[in-house]
Regions:
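Catalytic Walker B motif of ABC-type/P-loop ATPase nucleotide-binding domains
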Residues: 155-159
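Helix-to-loop junction immediately C-terminal to a conserved catalytic motif
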Residues: 51
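Conserved ABC transporter NBD signature motif
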Residues: 59-69, 75-76
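Helical segment within the ABC ATPase nucleotide-binding domain
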Residues: 170-183
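Conserved ABC ATPase "signature" region
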Residues: 100, 104, 109-126
Length: 201
């Protein structure tokens, strides 16, 4: 079995609070992997650790077979996209402008793929509409588009359906399945909603 992410007794403590306690898990390549737990169970902490936003207290993980204490982990992280907690969106920009900004940050040489990416997430008809005027579901989909800007093959989504109305949940579910089936992107989803995860993972 080929694994994108493997964790081994991964632990994170903050003074007297243990956010993550000895987590061992394996995310197979090509899967939609659901990571379920109540609020405060350490789901976001795990995502912050694998994204390099924090360091584990003990234990380890590997991404594409590269351990987190290797200097090459940076290269592995370039192959992943993530939406951690709330999407990183500039509210006074359009969807297209947000993506152009992300392309510049990543040093991508051309904007040629932006329209295709907007179409993929269902935001190709938003025109000059600013992100601040988007619905919550549209903002979530824009966040995913931004995470996809570097053409990753591993996507990490932190509570992607949290706060969405029923239609927004359906649209998010369809998008995640589409990314997995058509683009062969491995997806790790954290959620406290078991029913919704069971329809995906």
């Amino acid at each position: 079995m080929n694994y994108i992410l493997q964790t081994n007794s991964l632990t994170k403590k903050y003074k007297n609070f243990q956010a993550l306690n000895g987590l061992t898990m394996n995310v197979p390549k090509g899967s939609i992997y659901g990571f379920v737990g109540k609020n405060g169970a350490g789901k976001t902490t795990l995502i912050r650790l694998i994204c390099g936003l924090q360091e584990p207290t003990s234990g380890s993980f590997s991404l594409y077979g590269i351990r987190n204490d290797s200097k090459d982990i940076i290269k592995s992280r370039r192959r992943m996209g993530a939406v951690v907690e709330t999407p990183s969106i500039y509210m006074d920009m359009t969807a297209e402008e947000n993506l152009k900004h992300q392309y510049l940050i990543l040093g991508l040489p051309s904007f040629d793929c932006i329209q295709e990416l907007l179409k993929l997430v269902g935001l190709d008809n938003t025109g000059e509409k600013k992100a601040k005027n988007f619905s919550l579901g549209m903002k979530q989909r824009l966040g995913i588009a931004i995470a996809l800007a570097g053409d990753p093959d591993f996507l990490v989504l932190d509570e992607p359906v949290n706060g969405l109305d029923p239609q927004g949940i359906v649209e998010m579910r369809e998008l995640i399945l589409k990314l997995n089936r058509e683009k062969q992107i491995t997806v790790l989803i954290s959620s406290h909603i078991l029913d919704e995860l069971s329809r995906l993972a």
